[in-house]
Amino acid sequence: SLDDAEGDINISLNENKIKVAFGNFKIISKVIDGTFPDYTKVVPKNNDKNFSTKTNDLKNAIDRVSAVAINEEMKSKAIKLILNQNKLLLSVESQTKGFADEELDVNYNQDDVEIGFNSKYLIDICNEVDGEDINVSILDSISPAIIMDKSDENSFFVLMPMRI
């Protein structure tokens, strides 16, 4: 295993490939030459509706509410978020299994807004956030949201909404 490998690490590089060798292990990869895309163009700059809450509270509420859609023939697990004064209402509607909703206390005192997301993507993002608190910035129901770990503002996620 890699943990047991001892000795020197040899690195070889040519125009097309890079090779890293240590012990009995060799890793060979193709070298890609190109310009990294300008990701700043997809990061929204004017999301003015912000709310924050506990990361685990949000993740657990999404998980509970989206359970209504489990095992359905759905392309995605759409969840609706409705924000109003210090409240976040999460809801899922299933054609065969009914309706589920849950309300969370959040820090929010701006205009009401309603937006839909894929619940799986929201849970995946919550799982990647290390901090206790999460911040979500929204412009409107059709623009991407920015989701940030409040303890690490260098790490953020851009999530496209869904029509519900």
Briefly describe each language-model feature range.
Residues 33-41:
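Active-site loop ensemble at the mouth of alpha/beta enzyme cores that anchors a bound cofactor
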